Amino acid sequence: MEIKTDVVIVGTGVGGAFSALNLPEDKQILMITKSDLESSDSFLAQGGICVLRDEKDYDSYFEDTMRAGHYENRKESVDIMIRSSQEIIHDLIEYGVDFAKKDGNLAFTREGAHSRPRIL
């Protein structure tokens, strides 16, 4: 069997889906997964998505992420992840993701290695 496609995305979690959504609409995209959609890390994650709540949160978010990664994380990548988190959440809301809310505002929780509530 021969499959013709413009782009192959390995992974069907949030990262793979977000990558596909950000490609030009005229591209033929093939997404592959090692088993089924419910086995992706995104589907199995205990909570949600981390987001920088405000600039005062940056240092503790950075430290929490580095500590969770046993300080083996690439610092530049952690910085990009944190600084782009608000824009990505905005994009996900525009795509229709319905995050939990409390009193009309996003409801942040504290989970895992995070020292402050920053999980949606």
Predicted regions and their residues:
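A short, basic/flexible loop-to-alpha-helix module at the beginning of a structural domain
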Residues: 1-4, 111
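A generic short-segment signal for beta-strand/edge and adjacent turn/coil regions
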Residues: 1, 17-21, 48, 90
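Conserved N-terminal/central alpha/beta ligand/cofactor-binding core
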Residues: 37-120
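N-terminal Rossmann-like FAD-binding beta1-loop-alpha1 element of flavoenzymes
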Residues: 5-31
